[in-house]
Amino acid sequence: MGPDNQTKAMNFFTVDVEDWFQAGVMQKYLRLNPSMANQHRLEENLVVLLDMLDSYGYQGTFFCLGNLVGKYTSLLKLIAERGHEVASHGMTHTNLTSMDAKTLEWELKESKRILEDAVNQAVRGFRAPNFSITDAAIYALGEAGYEYDSSVFPITGRKGYGKLKELPMDARPYRFENGLWEYPLTTTALGPIQIPIAGGAYFRHFPFEWLLKRIDKAVKDGYFHVYVHPWEIDEKHPLVGGISALDRIRHYRNLDKMQDRIQQIFSKYSFNSINQNMTS
């Protein structure tokens, strides 16, 4: 079990439910070698994450692709049966910035519908693939019946990544005029810039003692939101031939340390799903 002194803390553990070959850095290699998509490792890695959460009694939010329904319906049901929140990650893991209005509407509505039918649970939240959120998507999410978004990542220097152009952005939960809530990912100030500490590659690559100090400050300030991908706890997933040195670092570095890093933050802080916060 985790610590009992932060049961009401606004600390969220979220998972982008994707297989290793769906990572952004892998897409150019997948186009050259489509057979990569036959080497599935999602289920075994996701079950490990579920077991880790269960061992501490925590609930998480799992942002799931609609196209997982069918092959992975039983896995999606398992997430819900273990008391976790199933939210939408879109249908096809396509960046929202590449969609016209009609395609965007279909992605949002169809993923919500198909996931709700699969797990018999209301899908309240959404996260854009690769944090490719847009102002238009915020309005479309409200029209599609979502209650919150979790795609804003207010870091410095990455254009189009977790950013809105005209609508407001903040580092803590806030509400848009259309009623949609936003649960942004956590950043930290480093001089005049905001850098990510919220998970994914950043959680793997930064020195962990430094990260813990920044996380501790975020928790004390009342809001910490971290995310992971199931493949990031799998140091044995396939090594792509011909991968560049930089991409190899980006994708594979510190995979062997990820489970321990998650265990350490689980033992130090309490975590909830976003849905728990909205209904409490």
Give each language-model segment a name.
Residues 117, 121-223:
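Active-site-adjacent pocket scaffolds in enzyme catalytic domains
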Residues 2, 6-82:
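Active-site beta->alpha N-cap acidic-glycine motif
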Residues 16, 53, 86-89, 111, ...:
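Conserved, mostly hydrophobic/aromatic
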Residues 56-136, 146, 151-152, 178-179, ...:
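Metal-dependent polysaccharide deacetylase catalytic core of the NodB/CE4 family, i.e.
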Residues 46-50, 73-77, 105-112, 138, ...:
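Generic structural signal for well-ordered alpha-helices
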Residues 18-20, 67-69, 92-93, 131-133, ...:
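Short, solvent-exposed loop/turn segments at secondary-structure junctions
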Residues 32-40, 63-65, 92-104, 124, ...:
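The substrate-binding groove and active-site-proximal loops of carbohydrate-active enzymes
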Residues 55, 205-280:
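C-terminal domain-boundary segment and adjacent tail
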